[in-house]
Amino acid sequence: MRLKDKVAIITGGSRGIGYATADKFLGEGARVILTASSQASAEKAVERLKEKYPDAIIAGISPDLASLESVREAFRSATEKYGCVDILVNNAGVSESTPFMEYTEETFDKVMDLNVKGVFNTTRAAAECMVARGTGVIL
């Protein structure tokens, strides 16, 4: 159990690579907080993982990753409940399969808000606790 009692936040953890990462981290003993675009998606993923790891500490949250204040508040709550974040996995992201000349500014903003601003916001929020402790891993 290489990650025993480590606190990991995994963005985009309700499906795909993020879900598989949460599964692996739980198997290694980590306490996992996964984020999803909706609370319902987060809770569904948590339920599935709890079936496999009934004694694990796992939670789902759905902050607006494009909002630093929303991310900070969610991370503060998680830190108060589970401890300082040891590992942040920046996995959330979106893409659009739209021809460039049909790409709208709104679509561009949506992609940039999650794929760039979201990574900045989650990294900034996690780093606050990590820097104070002098340790942590951000992926």
Regions found by a protein language model. Name each.
Residues 53-57, 76-88, 96:
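A glycine-rich helix->loop->beta "capping" turn
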Residues 28-45:
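Conserved glycine-rich Rossmann-like NAD(P)H-binding loop of the short-chain dehydrogenase/reductase
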Residues 6, 55, 84-85, 130-139:
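Active-site loop of short-chain dehydrogenase/reductase
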Residues 99-100, 107-112:
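Substrate-binding pocket helix/loop in short-chain dehydrogenase/reductase
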Residues 123-124:
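A short, exposed helix-loop element centered on a Lys and neighboring polar residues
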Residues 7, 14-16, 38:
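Conserved glycine-rich cofactor-binding loop
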Residues 39-40, 62-73, 105:
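The beta1-alpha1 cofactor-binding region of Rossmann-like NAD(H)/NADP(H)-dependent oxidoreductases
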